[in-house]
Regions:
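Bacterial Sec-dependent N-terminal signal peptides
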Residues: 1-27
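Short S/T/G/P-rich N-terminal loop/turn motif that feeds into the first structured element of a domain
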Residues: 20-272
Length: 272
């Protein structure tokens, strides 16, 4: 399955996530702008059975040309450690109006794929009903320093809450940071998204996809992010960025970071 176009997320979900156009490589295909993420809890003793069941379902419904694309990540740090993030992406809100698809917010009960999930996988979940999030990508924040079509094995999601009325400034700052990361030599990809549903509307999430912890460490190395930012925007801009950042976000607002691992056997796209 190497002839595929891949993007992450999240993020978004998380962001870029893997995505394909009829499972054929199309480097100029539009990337999704909206992601729907379902967070699934499974008891530890049922985790292996759950993963095996989702793998079987994926091979049956989500690996053929023209099939609905679904992607599974496992949270490996943070408050939701051990949970599964099951998601898909669409290019516009109008895509949610399409019939005969599982790639929609409210899947019809008569959908064959949905029925299969309810019969074979739902019994392995802690709850029949799972929390669902909708995230929308902020235009201009996407970047990709990896080869076209390359999936990412890991992802990091950072969430902050802005102050009301700061949307334009928040967008400006996130675009500037994405420009700096895009101009760097870091082998990462990512974007910034905003909660549309399922959480605090003031919440933004920055997704970073990577393939090795060594490469991610270059991003997290103390002081390195400031150097990356100033390499793009000029000397002294990092301090100004931090000062502005503090005025944009809620004082004492909840922040959260979590790391995730991509489960290729439970997803439409395999890793290279």
């Amino acid at each position: 399955m190497r002839n595929l176009i891949t993007i992450i997320v999240l993020f978004s979900g998380f962001t870029h996530v893997c995505f394909a156009d009829n499972h054929k490589k199309a480097e100029n295909a539009p990337e999704p702008s909206i992601y729907v993420v379902r967070h699934i809890e499974v008891d530890l003793e049922k985790a292996k059975d759950f993963e095996a069941a989702v793998e079987t379902k994926t091979k049956k419904y989500n690996r053929k040309e023209g099939s609905d694309l679904w992607f599974t990540w496992k949270v490996i740090s943070g408050p939701r450690t051990g949970q599964y993030a099951r998601l898909f992406g669409v290019q516009s809100w109008a895509d949610f109006d399409k019939a005969n698809t599982s790639n929609t917010i409210n899947i019809p009960r008569g959908n064959e794929e949905s029925s299969y999930w309810r019969e074979n996988i739902t019994p392995l979940q802690k709850s029949k009903s799972v929390p669902t999030e909708v995230w929308m990508v902020i235009p201009g924040t996407e970047y990709n320093n990896l080869e076209a079509g390359q999936a990412t094995r890991y992802g990091a999601l950072y969430k902050w809450k802005m102050k009301p009325g700061m949307y334009q400034k928040k967008t400006k700052y996130e675009i500037q940071m994405s420009e700096a990361l895009a101009a760097s030599d870091l082998k990462v990809r990512g974007s910034v998204m905003r909660f549309e549903s399922g959480g605090d509307y003031m919440t933004f999430g920055r997704w970073i996809g990577f393939n090795t912890w060594e490469e991610f460490g270059k991003f997290r190395e103390w002081g390195n992010l400031g150097k990356i930012y100033e390499a793009k925007h000029g000397k002294g801009t990092w301090v100004k960025y931090l000062e502005g950042w503090n005025t944009i976000h809620q004082d004492g607002g909840e922040t959260e970071t979590e790391y995730l691992e991509y489960l290729e056997d439970l997803s439409s796209i395999e890793l290279d």
